[in-house]
Every structure is written in structure tokens, then in C-alpha cells.
From Swiss-Prot:
Pfam families: AnmK
Function field: Catalyzes the specific phosphorylation of 1,6-anhydro-N-acetylmuramic acid (anhMurNAc) with the simultaneous cleavage of the 1,6-anhydro ring, generating MurNAc-6-P. Is required for the utilization of anhMurNAc either imported from the medium or derived from its own cell wall murein, and thus plays a role in cell wall recycling.
Superkingdom to which the source organism belongs: Bacteria
Reaction(s) this enzyme catalyzes, per UniProt: 1,6-anhydro-N-acetyl-beta-muramate + ATP + H2O = N-acetyl-D-muramate 6-phosphate + ADP + H(+)
E.C. code: 2.7.1.170
Species in which this protein is naturally found: Shewanella halifaxensis (strain HAW-EB4)
Protein name per the record: Anhydro-N-acetylmuramic acid kinase
GO biological process, one term: 1,6-anhydro-N-acetyl-beta-muramic acid catabolic process
Enzyme class, first EC level, given as a word: transferase
Gene3D superfamilies recorded: 3.30.420.40
This protein's pathway: Amino-sugar metabolism; 1,6-anhydro-N-acetylmuramate degradation; Cell wall biogenesis; peptidoglycan recycling
Length: 369
């Protein structure tokens, strides 16, 4: 009986569902066995979005949502194993990222907070859970993010190719994998899908801009784009990370107040270009040319991919499918990998990426028994 399975659970800043993956790490490369996405109920999504911003009665709401998300993550796991026909006894551990509700690493006492109670997940699945991956890195002086570059290095690095792995969720991050060297770098570039998702949700009641069609129907306002790109975050040197605390709907609306003459579609186009230009500007500081492999929800946005290719004519811009990994599941597999690293007593962070003082075993262990 194969007993080498790990489950990875991920809900990103876009909050578009809980991604669950079943992975085997016996070979040189991870083998994806099964996948499942558990939708977030509307009421739960609304409460999570509110919790991501300062408000009243936060501790009570936090405690309730921590348990509720734990139950949802457990439900996703059980559905995944049923779909795969795999018994829980065959799973070594679950690697749960949780749901980020605060990420503020640059305070004097920096912190990050993810919810989805791992004790609840362990109790309702009967499987050991490894969670809370980010806070050890912060305790060591790091940003606690991005964590996926260590995984990207493990599975995508090639000594003969200069590669950027671009993950576009609510926030976008890059991993730079230079050929013939171990000098991997990575950081959050800024907004990914988050701002354009929020705008279309607010204006049209749609969860996201499918294929970037609404953005494509508008015209980018260059004055507004330059205003958005003047945000101090874009000028920061790595290591750096960001989140909804900085780039959120309230921030966008504050910026838009100076540009009331624009159509809704023009604003959507401009928000998409903010994502594309901030990514392209950072890519060009890393290298004039190379290969860019895109994963996350943004990989399915045709207009976004088209604009990136125009901004980076000397880059080959494709999705991670060309490297044999479905763009939707890369992050989930990464957290299954981090669970495997923890289980085997191996470090999971890259200090050159996060700014931590040293490598460390990431995550806390929550036994099923």
C-alpha cells in the first residue's frame, strides 16, 4: 500500500475557493494524483473580506471564522480523498496554508496571520496537519512571504535556462531562477487579480473578469496608470511582500476619486495594466530576457497574458503547463511540499527571498490523535 501521499490546502488572497491537491513525492518531481476546489459560501466570503480590514469585534469574528474555515478546509480534504479513492491512512500529512487575514511584516513587531484552525482540520479528517508556515520566517526577521520560491527552485530550476515563475493570485509574486547559479530571488510585485476582481464585483456583480474581456473593452488612462504606479511599494527593494492591507478596494477607490471622468471599463483596463506594468517593470530589473512561466488564476486571463507579452517582447511568456504543471494547482502542490519538508526535518524557506536570518523548518504540527 502506498503511504507517501500528502495533501496541500490553499486559499489565496483572491478568496475564490479552497484548492485541495493530493500529491506523491516519491519521484524526482511531484506527482499530482487528484484535485478538488471547495467554493467559499457567500456569507463566509463576505465575513472574511470584512475581517481583512480593521473593524469592530474583531476577536470574536476571528475566532468564529477560524473554526468555520477549518471545517471548510476539512470538507475540501475529505471530498478530495473520496474523489481519489484514497483512504486517510495513506496520507502522511496535510499541509494547510490557511486563509491570510493580516500580513504586516514591516511593523516594528511584524506579524502575519492565517486562519483555518488546523486542530479542526485534523479532528474532522483524521489526518495529521502541518500549518502556520509563515510565522517562523517572520520570527527570524523575514517577510514570511513569498514561500513558494523554494518549491519553484526545486521543481522548475534548470541550469541551462533563465526563468521567472510568476504566480498571479490576488497578489502577484515572482521567483527568479537564474541559470548556472543558486542565487534565487523572489518577491511580491504588487496587485495581481485582486483589484480588478474587486472592481468587477462592485460594478457588475461578477466574481472576476473572464478572459479579461471587460478590461479589453476599455482603454487605459495613462495619467491614472502612472499615478497608481507611483505608490511607494513599487520602488521598494526586495525582500518585500504585500497583501490586501495595502492594495484593496478602499485604496483603489481613493485613487479613483481623482479620475471620476473615466468609464468603468476604462478603469478596469487601467487596473489590469497596473498589474501588468508592475510585473513587467520588476521582470526587466531581473533580466532583459528569458522565460516567464505563469501560474495562478491570472494564467487563465487571456488579456493579461497578451499585455504581458507586449510589455516583455524578449521574454517567452507561457504558463507552467509547458513545464508539466497545471497553473491552477502549483500553490497547493507547494504547500503539500512544505508539509513533506517539515515531516522530513528539512527547511522550507529561502532567506535570500524572505530576508530571514537563516533557513528553518516551517510550520507547526497538529496530530490527528
Amino acid at each position: 500500500m502506498n503511504n507517501s501521499y500528502y495533501v496541500g490546502l490553499m486559499s489565496g488572497t483572491s478568496m475564490d475557493g479552497v484548492d485541495a491537491v493530493l500529491v506523491n513525492f516519491d519521484g524526482d518531481q511531484p506527482s499530482l494524483i487528484a484535485t478538488h476546489t471547495e467554493a467559499l459560501p457567500k456569507a463566509l466570503l463576505s465575513n472574511l473580506q470584512k475581517l481583512c480590514l480593521p473593524g469592530n469585534d474583531e476577536i470574536n469574528r476571528l475566532g468564529h471564522l477560524d473554526r468555520a474555515m477549518g471545517k471548510l478546509f476539512a470538507k475540501a480534504t475529505n471530498a478530495l480523498l473520496e474523489k481519489a479513492g484514497v483512504d486517510k491512512s495513506q496520507v502522511i500529512a496535510i499541509g494547510s496554508h490557511g486563509q491570510t487575514v493580516r500580513h504586516m511584516p514591516n511593523l516594528e513587531m511584524g506579524f502575519t496571520l492565517q486562519i483555518a484552525d488546523p486542530n479542526t482540520i485534523a479532528a474532522e479528517t483524521g489526518i495529521d496537519v502541518i500549518a502556520d508556515f509563515r510565522r517562523k520566517d517572520i520570527a527570524l526577521g523575514g517577510q514570511g512571504a513569498p514561500l513558494v520560491p523554494a518549491f519553484h527552485q526545486h521543481v522548475f530550476a534548470n541550469p541551462n535556462h533563465q526563468r521567472i515563475i510568476l504566480n498571479i493570485g490576488g497578489i502577484a509574486n515572482v521567483t527568479y531562477l537564474p541559470g548556472n547559479t543558486q542565487d534565487v530571488t523572489g518577491f511580491d510585485t504588487g496587485p495581481g487579480n485582486g483589484l480588478s476582481d474587486a472592481w468587477i464585483q462592485h460594478q457588475l456583480g461578477q466574481p472576476f473578469d473572464k478572459d479579461g474581456a471587460w478590461a479589453a473593452s476599455g482603454t487605459t488612462d495613462q495619467k491614472m496608470l502612472q499615478h497608481l504606479l507611483s505608490h511607494p511599494y513599487f520602488a521598494l527593494a526586495a525582500p518585500k511582500s504585500t497583501g490586501r492591507e495595502l492594495f484593496n478596494q478602499a485604496w483603489a477607490e481613493q485613487q479613483l476619486s481623482e479620475f471620476g471622468h473615466l468609464s468603468e471599463a476604462d478603469i478596469q483596463s487601467t487596473l489590469l495594466d497596473l498589474t501588468c506594468y508592475s510585473i513587467a517593470n520588476d521582470a526587466l530589473t531581473l533580466s532583459d530576457n528569458g522565460e516567464m512561466y505563469v501560474c495562478g488564476g491570472g494564467a487563465y486571463n487571456c488579456e493579461l497574458m497578451h499585455r504581458l507579452r507586449k510589455l516583455l517582447p524578449d521574454y517567452k511568456v507561457v504558463t507552467t503547463s509547458e513545464l508539466g504543471m497545471d497553473p491552477q494547482w502549483v500553490e497547493g502542490i507547494a504547500f503539500a511540499w512544505l508539509a513533506m519538508r517539515h515531516h522530513n526535518g528539512l527547511p522550507g524557506n529561502l532567506p535570500a527571498v524572505t530576508g530571514a536570518s537563516r533557513e528553518a523548518i516551517l510550520g507547526s504540527f497538529h496530530p490527528a490523535d
